[in-house]
Amino acid sequence: MRIKDILYWRVYYKILQLCVRLFYYLPVNKHKFVLMHDFGNAYGDSPKFIAEEIIRRGLPYDLVWLVNNMSYSFPKPIRKVKLSHIKSVYELATAKVIITTMKGRCNLKKKKNQFFMYVPHGQIGAKFVERQAGTTLNTEYINGSKWHSSVSDLFISSSKLFTEEMLTWYWYDGEVMECGLPRNDIFFHYTPNDVKRIKTEVGVPENVKIVLYGPTFRNEKSNDPYAIDTDRLLTALEQKTGDKWIFLFRAHPNFVWYGKPAFDYSDKVIDVTNYPDMQELLLISDVLISDYSSTMFDFNLMHRPVFLFTKDIEAYQKMRGLKDWYFKVPFPFCHNNDELIQAVQNYDEQKYHEACKSFDKFYGNLETGTASQQIVNRLETIMR
């Protein structure tokens, strides 16, 4: 970056911080929501389903979505505002309710009559988190997470185990609403037309089955942890089921900054990283391959098979730490391509479902498909 650019952003940051302090004295708009998904991502995740429930009810609220890219498409009446623009500071300062999916600092000096809600971007994860992760997280992230917890009025939880974790490791001792995640409501209320629409948007034939690969992020550029042999996998699935299959790859959002893993893309191996809604991709998929991501629990709500491709499990355990219960999940661990193919060949639907039901009880699953309704009910009482 050129010196001129560095100076520009330093000055701009100073101006933003000045605006944060000045806008603190502006009145709060009792009908305004500000929603933010993953620090400026497109229309998706739980805020999308909260917004759609508000719109469905015809509630007279001003819905503002903070984005990094103004070309993102949003339904009316949602207003897009550039996250890095001074206008976003104004929207945050004057909003009654602020909803985020990521823990971290934003350009806000919170007022007593504002309500700050955290809806996690995933269910409970296998990796060590927050205070539990210790020195594996950088100081900037830890400070941002502590700030986020200090201003939060409500955390949303999807399981009893997640609630326990939040209150133990997240530097948070406030209220936790145990209702499930709005983004997972879709798994309880979809129709065949929903599946058909999404497949059309993705570019997948209606009569083809889908295996979705959604790995978590690593702080390294090696392609080795993600090296699934797609040809062998698709052949094994076709032999197991007698159906035609397509492999979809969905990269973690952080891969944008580090470069995502490479596959030999074709009409049977498709990159869907830019598709805005991960839950819709899960909905149309018949098999999920993941690793240490909480996506496995989202997908399991539909009782469809999950396989864990954990080629680097020992290295990842040393780098980030993995919780003890992770090694008890009912999903097959596959440390290489041979084990992945064998797991597909040996899959037994009845035994798998029984194991999943038992694990649901262990971690206290709270998903019922009504999270959006419950949260908007709560927000209506706050907006009065």
Task: Indicate where each model-derived feature is located.
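Catalytic binding pocket for nucleotide-activated donors in carbohydrate/polymer assembly enzymes
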Residues: 178, 264, 294-363
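C-terminal amphipathic helix plus adjacent low-complexity
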Residues: 1-4, 24, 337-384
